[in-house]
Swiss-Prot record:
The lineage of its organism: Eukaryota, Metazoa, Chordata, Craniata, Vertebrata. Transcription factor involved in anterior and eye development. Promotes the differentiation of both rod and cone photoreceptors cells in the retina. Together with other retinal homeobox proteins, acts as an effector of a cellular clock which, depending on cell cycle progression, establishes the generation of distinct retinal neuronal cell types. Acts synergistically with nrl to activate the rhodopsin promoter. Promotes the formation of anterior regions and represses the formation of posterior structures during development. Initially expressed in the Spemann organizer of early gastrula embryos. Expression in the organizer begins to decrease during late gastrulation and has disappeared by stage 11.5. Expression then persists and intensifies in the anterior neuroectoderm. Exhibits a dynamic expression pattern during neurulation and by neural tube closure (stage 20), expression is restricted to the cement gland anlage and epiphysis (pineal gland) anlagen. During tailbud stages, expression in the cement gland decreases and from stage 24, expression appears in the neural retina. One of its GO terms (biological process) is regulation of transcription by RNA polymerase II. It is found in: Nucleus. It comes from the Eukaryota. Keywords: Developmental protein, Differentiation, DNA-binding, Homeobox, Nucleus, Transcription, Transcription regulation. GO terms for cellular component: nucleus. This is Homeobox protein otx5-B. InterPro entries: HD, Homeobox_CS, Homeodomain-like_sf, Otx_TF, Otx_TF_C. Residues 94-103, 116-129 have a biased composition (Polar residues).
Length: 290
């Protein structure tokens, strides 16, 4: 009998059932009655209330709770409304500052572009001024000093590389020997005597001024050495015709050297393996520099 009485609480439309499922069911049924929050009414401030709030905002933008409560009592509004008003007022102030800075930004941008233009103009002027220094560096005085340093007795004569390939040591040049360059006639200057130019130097023996390729007969001389040799050998046409020299070619072998011994009479060309050039008369020499 008692068991029969206990059973009905399972069959009364589920209202007397106990469990988490029924609790969730009841809670879910309660939500549709109030689906969203009620909207708060907008607060309309009078002019007197705004004056009081603005005066406090001028003093401090972040009033503490005591200041807000005091102002709320003055304007007959709750403290929460005063707090929201200060929050909105600070946001409005930040927005105004951003707008003012946004309007002021183009002006500094223009100021920034003007230095960029100035730097571009300076770069262009620098580009205009950069070419003249190399051009001005090439002056007759500087070129003359360069030639003096090149043709100094202690320096080596600038002979091309093909002419320096010589097997015989007597054909190698030990000191500088001036030659005439036809490409720079504007800077050529003739020096009468060599005794003052080559001071303190033993000019008794000068090596050959030419180093042609001696491997093949008839090797052509360089344009630098050919006119110089022609000028020196013009005093002995008989020896030239006897040896069969052309205008720009020589026929002696790799062991031949030139020997200039007699400076007054006609020069003779002896092609011996052990002889080298001897320049004894130095007063008749003429040197031309670039």
């Amino acid at each position: 009998m008692m068991s029969y009485i206990k059973q009905p609480h399972y069959a009364v439309n589920g209202l007397t059932l106990a469990g988490t499922g029924m609790d969730l069911l009841h809670s879910a049924v309660g939500y549709p009655t109030n689906p969203r929050k009620q909207r708060r009414e907008r607060t309309t401030f009078t002019r007197a209330q705004l004056d009081i709030l603005e005066s406090l905002f001028a003093k401090t933008r972040y009033p503490d709770i005591f200041m807000r409560e005091e102002v709320a009592l003055k304007i007959n509004l709750p403290e929460s409304r005063v707090q929201v008003w200060f929050k909105n007022r600070r946001a409005k102030c930040r927005q105004q500052q951003q707008q003012s800075t946004g309007q002021a930004k183009p002006r500094p941008a223009k100021k920034k572009t003007s230095p960029a233009r100035e730097t571009n103009s300076e770069a262009s002027t620098n580009g205009q001024y950069s070419p003249p220094p190399p051009g001005t560096a090439v002056t007759p005085s500087s070129s003359a000093s360069a030639t003096v340093s090149i043709w100094s007795p202690a320096s080596i004569s600038p002979i091309p590389d093909p002419l320096s390939a010589v097997t015989n040591p007597c054909m190698q040049r030990s000191t500088g020997y001036p030659m005439t360059y036809s490409q720079a006639p504007a800077y050529t200057q003739s020096y009468g005597g060599s005794s003052s130019y080559f001071t303190g130097l033993d000019c008794g023996s000068y090596l050959s001024p030419m180093h042609p390729q001696l491997s093949a007969p008839g090797a052509t001389l360089s344009p630098i050495a050919t006119p110089t040799m022609g000028s020196h050998l013009s005093q002995s046409p008989a020896s030239l015709s006897a040896q069969g020299y052309g205008a720009a070619s020589l026929g002696f072998t790799s062991v031949d050297c030139l020997d200039y011994k007699d400076q007054t009479a006609s020069w003779k060309l002896n092609f011996n393996a052990t002889d080298c050039l001897d320049y004894k008369d130095q007063s008749s020499w003429k040197f031309q520099v670039l």
